[in-house]
């Protein structure tokens, strides 16, 4: 999926917005169903549960957190956006930090990542590790990635791993 985006004048990555280009025909209306519907429901607060997690109760879930200082040369693209793959890498680092020794060879079976925002080079981010569950050779966890400076949500991830 591709989109054209722009930043507001002087706003950096905190002000990124999707834009339409006059030279291109309008995009086809999105088909509702599947991931598009799931994403819309999550962002609007209508999705109550995902991967077995109560989405309305993040603050009450057992939480640990650590901060990451992304490297401008490795984690950002030429336009100054944090790479989507870096988000996933930070989730894997959180798993390794909080649970890795128990699951050194874990294999990802499913992962849904919902992106909400971005950061500028030089900003730190926080990964919150929420209510991991283990059982029957599986590890399921939810992570929130937040801008460390103001707590703004950057992404929400749900992962199922074989351990």
Summary of predicted features, one role per range:
Residues 8-109:
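Hot-dog-fold acyl-thioester-processing enzymes
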Residues 2-5, 69, 114:
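Residues in well-ordered beta-strands of folded domains
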Residues 61-65, 124, 138:
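A general secondary-structure signal for short beta-strands and their flanking turns/coil
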Residues 67, 126-128, 140-142:
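Beta-strand secondary-structure signal
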Residues 94-135, 154-162:
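Hydrophobic beta-strand-centered segment that forms part of the acyl-chain substrate-binding groove
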Residues 1-39, 121, 131-163:
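HotDog/MaoC-like acyl-thioester-processing domains
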């Amino acid at each position: 999926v591709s989109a054209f985006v722009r930043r507001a004048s002087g706003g950096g990555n905190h002000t990124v917005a999707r834009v339409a280009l006059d030279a291109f025909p309008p995009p086809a209306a999105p088909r509702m169903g599947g991931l598009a519907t799931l994403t819309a429901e999550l962002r609007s607060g209508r999705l109550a549960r995902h991967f077995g997690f109560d989405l309305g109760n993040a603050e009450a879930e057992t939480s640990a957190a650590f901060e990451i200082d992304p490297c401008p040369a490795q984690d950002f693209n030429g336009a100054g956006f944090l790479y989507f793959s870096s988000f996933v890498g930070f989730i894997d680092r959180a798993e390794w930090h909080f649970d890795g020794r128990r699951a050194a060879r874990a294999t990802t079976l499913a992962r849904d990542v919902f992106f909400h925002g971005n950061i500028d080079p030089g900003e730190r981010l926080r990964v919150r590790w929420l209510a991991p569950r283990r059982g029957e050779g599986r590890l399921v966890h939810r992570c929130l990635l937040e801008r460390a400076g103001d707590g703004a949500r950057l992404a929400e991830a749900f992962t199922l791993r074989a351990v």
